[in-house]
Amino acid sequence: MESFEKLEKLLSYSFKNKELLIEALSHPSLRQHHEYKDDKDYERLEFLGDAVLNLVITEILFRNFANYNEGNLAKIRSYLVCKETICMVGAKLTLKNYIIMTHGEEVAGGRDNLNNIENATEALIAAIYLDSNIETTHDIIEKLWAEFIKVQNLTDYDPKTALQEWAQASDHHLPIYRLIKREGASHSSTFTVLVKVKDYEQTGTGHAIKEAEKNAARSLLHRLKND
């Protein structure tokens, strides 16, 4: 496990209360470990972090996307706070290297488990909020999510809806998605999905079926635009 100082540098934030940081990175498996003296793990912080993240992302979208209606804002927010995006932020922070877990959890692939990375990322947001204030937390979230927020094309946020709308506008049947391949262990599988609309088809991959479907839809949309 790497030192917390490296993580704080990536965050551009130094915790005043290091116990909050430790709690945010403590996997629930530790509660069953006889040598673990504390009964705290990241589950409660994750609950708070989810709410803080939703609030901050909602405010950012409301401020930056003045021409988008409520429906489109909701779709973009859904993309920004979904498991895949949160895990990409966690990957940027190399968060899997900092999660404190039992040896058994680690051997079972816990460091690459997307649920663990998502939960720890949300818990980390809550820890920053409790250690500082909403303004500081807002700035950190805006920085970490910047590359995703910059995408202003709804196609990139919600490619499945965009592809469905294209199919309907072109008088085609709705897109059909089919899982064609699954590779890897159960905790770190890679899925390949084929999407088909009329005579057009494209594949996409991801660590979840929904992610693979989105990537397939996005690839097909890009192909249709370039044809």
Swiss-Prot record:
Cofactor (UniProt): Mg(2+)
The enzyme's E.C. designation: 3.1.26.3
Gene3D superfamilies per UniProt: 3.30.160.20, Ribonuclease III domain
A GO cellular component entry from the record: cytoplasm
Active site: D50, E122
EC category: hydrolase
Main localization, broad class: cytoplasm
Binding site for Mg(2+): E46, N119, E122
Domain DRBM: 158-226
SMART domains listed in its UniProt record: DSRM (SM00358), RIBOc (SM00535)
Molecular function GO labels: double-stranded RNA binding; metal ion binding; ribonuclease III activity; rRNA binding
Subcellular location: Cytoplasm
Keywords: Cytoplasm, Endonuclease, Hydrolase, Magnesium, Metal-binding, mRNA processing, Nuclease, RNA-binding, rRNA processing, rRNA-binding, tRNA processing
Record field: catalytic activity: Endonucleolytic cleavage to 5'-phosphomonoester
GO terms for biological process, alphabetical: mRNA processing; regulation of gene expression; rRNA processing; tRNA processing
Domain RNase III: 4-133
Keyword check for Ligase: no
Pfam families per the UniProt record, alphabetical: dsrm, Ribonucleas_3_3
Keyword Cell membrane carried by entry: no
Signal peptide boundaries: none
Protein task: Digests double-stranded RNA. Involved in the processing of primary rRNA transcript to yield the immediate precursors to the large and small rRNAs (23S and 16S). Processes some mRNAs, and tRNAs when they are encoded in the rRNA operon. Processes pre-crRNA and tracrRNA of type II CRISPR loci if present in the organism.
Family note: Belongs to the ribonuclease III family.
Subunit structure: Homodimer.
Extra facts: Belongs to an operon consisting of at least secF-nuoF-lepB-rnc.
Protein name: Ribonuclease 3
